[in-house]
């Protein structure tokens, strides 16, 4: 938590003073995102003061992630980098340069930002559609696997019934063959009865 009190703290500052200084620096560094404010500072000669230039160098600690997360206007870090160059500090005193920067910022918000949001939405929609297609394909593959298992299951029953029918036909075919050995005996009995009847007829 001590980091939020800013860098460059000394032993003379109390914790309350450090916190207040951190809040002041947070507010000031975010004001740098306004080109009109930069033009105001340039026209007042602040950018010619070496102590103020050193202060701008000191404020670069806001670029660190531990501090940048508190910024509501991160565009200020871009202008903070530009202010490190003497050429930019000299040109920003011109009102036309300030107006050009302001117009470019407005154009970015009106067009680029909206286009970027639309691109992000399109990419998100495409990813969602791809995920849905993958899910549908997985479901279709699962249904095909289940259908294939059901169609393959009756095969043993068909083979079993066919083998049963074959065994029945085989047994029915064997029955006459088994009955054939008894035919000669029956034939002999029939022949014996017929010969006995003939003898009786002759005696009469």
Curated annotation (Swiss-Prot):
Molecular-function annotations in GO: transcription coregulator activity
Localization per Swiss-Prot or TrEMBL: Nucleus
GO BP of this protein: anterior/posterior axis specification, embryo; positive regulation of DNA-templated transcription; regulation of transcription by RNA polymerase II
Listed Pfam families: Med31
Family, as annotated: Belongs to the Mediator complex subunit 31 family.
Binding partners and assembly: Component of the Mediator complex, which includes at least MED4, MED6, MED14, MED17, MED18, MED20, MED21, MED23, MED24, MED27, MED30 and MED31.
Protein's name according to its UniProt entry: Mediator of RNA polymerase II transcription subunit 31
């Amino acid at each position: 938590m001590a980091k939020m009190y800013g860098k460059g703290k000394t032993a003379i500052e109390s914790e309350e003073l450090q916190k207040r200084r951190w809040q002041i620096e947070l507010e000031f560094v975010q004001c740098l995102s306004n080109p009109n404010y930069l033009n105001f500072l340039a026209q007042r000669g602040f950018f010619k003061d070496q102590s103020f230039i050193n202060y701008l160098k000191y404020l670069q600690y806001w670029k660190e992630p531990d501090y940048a997360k508190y910024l509501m206007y991160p565009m200020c870090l871009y202008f903070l980098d530009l202010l490190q160059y003497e050429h930019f500090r000299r040109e920003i005193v011109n009102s036309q340069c300030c107006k050009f920067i302001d117009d470019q910022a407005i154009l970015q918000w009106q067009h680029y930002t909206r286009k970027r949001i639309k691109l992000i939405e399109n990419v998100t929609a495409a990813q969602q559609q791809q995920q849905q297609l993958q899910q549908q394909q997985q479901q279709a593959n699962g249904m095909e696997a289940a259908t294939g298992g059901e169609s393959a299951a009756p095969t043993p029953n068909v083979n079993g019934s066919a083998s049963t029918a074959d065994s029945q036909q085989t047994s029915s075919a064997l029955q006459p063959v088994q009955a054939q050995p008894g035919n000669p005996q029956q034939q002999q009995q029939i022949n014996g009865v017929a010969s006995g009847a003939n003898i009786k007829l002759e005696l009469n």
